[in-house]
Amino acid sequence: MRNIVKGILALLLSIVVTGAQMGQSQTIRDKNNSTIARIDSDGTVRNSSNSTIAHINSNGDIRDSSNRLLGTVSSDGTVRNSNNSYIGKIESDGTVRNRNNSYVGKVYQDGTVRNSNNSTIGYAKDVPVRYAAIYFFFDLI
């Protein structure tokens, strides 16, 4: 699940798509409300120790701190890994599906993130839905 956190980079593309504000960093929190990541306005994703773990460019490419491609997220929510293999979809309402089209969870408009058992696994208030979904549900790193 920690590797999924790094995948949050893909969510940065959604800021442009959704028109979210990027003036300051956006915070990802675990189920205990502890900060586990931040997304800077330039697309840099940092862990709770403030170390850079990933970056996403305007094309939706998700790259690690060494600039290696980890995956991509398209404007329609399609998520692909570094081999360009389809690994899932983030629907417009925040529903997340895996490569087999199985429901794995949802990111709600208030920022609450729940898994397929409807258990809260984290919070991403003011974070674009796609970014939160990538962070919590896709292992791109």
Located regions from the model:
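Long terminal segments
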Residues: 2-52, 58-60, 68-69, 75-141
